[in-house]
From Swiss-Prot:
Membrane-protein topology: Single-pass membrane protein
Function: One of the components of the core complex of photosystem II (PSII). PSII is a light-driven water:plastoquinone oxidoreductase that uses light energy to abstract electrons from H(2)O, generating O(2) and a proton gradient subsequently used for ATP formation. It consists of a core antenna complex that captures photons, and an electron transfer chain that converts photonic excitation into a charge separation.
Highest classification ranks of the organism: Eukaryota, Viridiplantae, Chlorophyta, Ulvophyceae, OUU clade
Location of the protein in the cell: Plastid, Chloroplast thylakoid membrane
Stated name of the protein: Photosystem II reaction center protein K
Length: 44
């Protein structure tokens, strides 16, 4: 059952491959946003 599910997952999520490729970058963007926000608050 698990092997069948794992075999079907790539085909089912084929349209979402670009989204999965971008997902690891999102936390880095939030971290960069936090640094920029802190800099703007401290410089005010």
């Amino acid at each position: 059952m698990t092997t069948l599910l794992l075999a079907k997952l790539p085909e089912a999520y084929a349209p979402f491959d670009p989204i999965v490729d971008v997902l690891p970058v999102i936390p880095l963007l939030f971290l960069l946003l936090a640094f920029v926000w802190q800099a703007s608050v401290s410089f005010r």
